[in-house]
Amino acid sequence: MSRPEAQGWCPTAFHPMMSGDGMLLRVRPQFNRLSLEQALGLCGIAEQFGNGLIDFTSRAAVQIRGLTPASFTKALSALQSLSLVSQTASHEALRGVLLSPEWQENDLTYRLTQALYDRLDELPELPAKFGFAMDTGRQPVLQGCSADIRLETSKDGRLLLIEDGADFGRSVSQDTAISALIALAHMFSQAIRGGNPNTRMRNLPSPLQSAQDEYAYKRQLSFASLPLGKTALGFHLAPAFGQTTSQDFTELLIQSDCAFLRLTPWRGLLLERASNLTIPPGFISDEQDPKLRIQVCPGAPACQSAKGNTRGFAARMAPRLGANPALNSKDLHISGCAKGCAKPQKTDLTFVAQNCGFDVIVKGHAWDKPIITGLDPDIILQNLDGF
């Protein structure tokens, strides 16, 4: 079955998206980093102008929910005063830059990112979901994250410019990397001219760079990411199912006594230099927590397309996963509709909300043919190991 048409764009601070609980606005801080003052200010804005709910995304961004047309303009102005949003919509649209979360000030990742920020005006108009990954640590950690153009290091330490989906990259120097990245973005813009404006790099029929080029080198494949818990830079944790409240987030920030925090592309946050942290309810710091194995969208009533309460179902399902050894190796996806926004890849078990119950799909996408339709949630929970 083919996938239903999903939104071809993501919300930004200037172009919020209407959802079931009002407008939602996305904030993409530079370097994926906020100061304590900025983070507390964001919580206050979410409480004052929205419904107090804050989403953490897989693109190292946060979303404020429940805005109205009147409160949106006030929220935007307040975010700009905190330097969390650009002064122009054109600049804000190009801030989709992911950084390897353990970057250090003035290291290669930092310098390349700063150079890109300085030259945003040189980029062409790009699809709304187009993004860049600065993944230049010793080992890539962002290969499982969404990005169209990547800078990575090879096993022998070369800096490579890589198109998403390619198994090779072009060798570039630190001085030429950003110029080459901008040139590749222009090549992409030319390649999709007259076609689908929402095309992504991985959808092109063939790479724009040649694998036969004398400067082409095999990329270093990696399944690494940043584990939850204590790290060299602080403490990495995640809100359950990617969402928290402004009040809970504020309490966490004050208790952590951190000066800065980083947003990670696993719907998490890295509290810099936090120590002796008591994890509050609603946040996860254990990689074995079964809630991490459930990918779930906001669901109803937050999403207008959703037909069921996905997060409530996920909260009931998580303890069953943890208590059943037969499910230890399975990943699950709960989707409010057949678009499968939370996880567009195949999953061991997918449950798609319908007006009555959930459809069950085994080793497929949310839009694939189900083996059972409209099953009662209680029956699903009683028979999780039987699918």
PLM region spans:
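Intrinsically disordered, low-complexity polar/charged tails and linkers
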Residues: 1-16, 224-225
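Small-residue-enriched alpha-helical segments and adjacent helix-cap loops
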Residues: 2-3, 19-162, 167, 171-175, ...
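Residues that cap or delimit alpha-helices
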Residues: 68, 205-212, 275, 376
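Generic structural signal of hydrophobic/aromatic residues within well-ordered alpha-helices
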Residues: 75, 116, 201, 211-212, ...
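Flexible helix-coil linker/hinge segments at domain or subdomain boundaries
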Residues: 87-91, 189-198, 378-387
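An acidic, glycine-/histidine-flanked metal-binding catalytic module
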Residues: 153-223, 262-263
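Rieske [2Fe-2S] iron-sulfur domain-containing proteins
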Residues: 182-185, 189-193, 214-255, 259
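Short Fe-S-cluster ligation motifs
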Residues: 333-346, 361-387
